[in-house]
């Protein structure tokens, strides 16, 4: 076991803060309408240009192991916020940096770290309640468009595309983002279905960077039993291999030998295949598999219908123009099922909804109906160069996630104003002692950081702007895009409540843990052994 280096107390926290600052300073330049781009070096191909905070954070690895620990912990803030809300990663990073900087000053001054953390936690809970109280529903197309526009770095075209997509497939409908072939952004709506099951092995992923599987024109096998014997699949695999097309297997499960064989064949290029678990449970699972079979033109292979897997042939397989699989979801686009059969299936589900006794059953049936009839909206991003395409696609992805978050939990005034207005909820809030009170004061000050950074990135004087915003009430705030003050909602500058809430909660959580850190342990790098001295040239004695 390699020897370890241990840092304690102020020395440990100082190293950790250096790492946090390095990462946060690189991320926070992207915040706001006048935020700057960051260029990321890639081991192959052209560098990536991005304004996406979490993309910047993910690229950062520091040489000093203790500084790197600090950077990686704050990277977790950005990643968690992106996972939960899909946006707000830069805001979360800025909040975490502000909290940690002030918190470590307080610890150095002799305050109790645990009491500081309790004060921060208490203030966070109160601020979350206030944000929910300030929130307004986001249901009309105009609000949806405004949220999409702001999250796409004030790109009105993107906001309109997202609003149009939601209008066509519904707010709960499936919307995907692809790289387009032209210079202009496009919106296509194609019949499709998404369910919440991903690939059974990451080795099925065709795109190692995004860990996704993209199958063009695949065959689709739908089975309602566990597959553990590969011999049952051999006739299908041989037929698919000869055709040169891909195969998607949807089954209750694929186990042991069968899964291992599929993975090996996929990695060797013998047959391009991906296996996913069937969605749902019990009778609902069988019904959903029948829905997918109807959509893709496949025969549902079930022993209940006197069909055995080993007797299945190519005629029983369905097809679709494209299938996208992630670790969590599978999306089937443009299934080859007959329109009459799909319409008949939809009518059966509608009849079941009318007869459903419980709200739960009705809700699940409506989900199936939406998946079968709603279709998939595809936003095709257009750009002149590949670098611009990647940067724009990241922005559209962010905007889509932010819009979904807004529909889910509502909207608040954007531009950091909601956090400033939430400060009043901390008036009169006290802890059990002075150190807890200081923790509350820390958070009160830290939540001004996003607005200060937006102003700073726009070239303004942050203290002047913050004081001006504080002196007013309601949605009054600062529009950094054109250097004006006014009602943020009327100007269309909105933030999803879920994004602001998630950023605050994750930043406070991580900052609290880091403030209470007293020791750091890292491995000591062993010195590389010296290179042996080279021998003499051929036919000559060795050098002395």
Curated annotation (Swiss-Prot):
A molecular function annotated in GO for this UniProt entry is:
isomerase activity
Q: Which residues bind ATP?
A: 30-33, 51, 87-91, 415, 479-481, 495
Alphabetic keyword roster: ATP-binding, Chaperone, Cytoplasm, Isomerase, Nucleotide-binding
For this entry, list what GO says about its biological process: protein refolding
Task: List the subcellular locations.
Answer: Cytoplasm
Q: Show the catalytic activity.
A: ATP + H2O + a folded polypeptide = ADP + phosphate + an unfolded polypeptide
Its predominant location is cytoplasm
What is the E.C. number? 5.6.1.7
Q: What class of enzyme is it?
A: isomerase
Function text: Together with its co-chaperonin GroES, plays an essential role in assisting protein folding. The GroEL-GroES system forms a nano-cage that allows encapsulation of the non-native substrate proteins and provides a physical environment optimized to promote and accelerate protein folding.
- Name the family the entry cites: Belongs to the chaperonin (HSP60) family.
Q: How does the record describe its quaternary structure?
A: Forms a cylinder of 14 subunits composed of two heptameric rings stacked back-to-back. Interacts with the co-chaperonin GroES.
Q: What name goes with this protein? A: Chaperonin GroEL
Q: Record the organism.
A: Francisella tularensis subsp. tularensis (strain WY96-3418)
For this protein's source organism, the top of the classification is: Bacteria, Pseudomonadati, Pseudomonadota, Gammaproteobacteria, Thiotrichales
The encoding gene is groEL
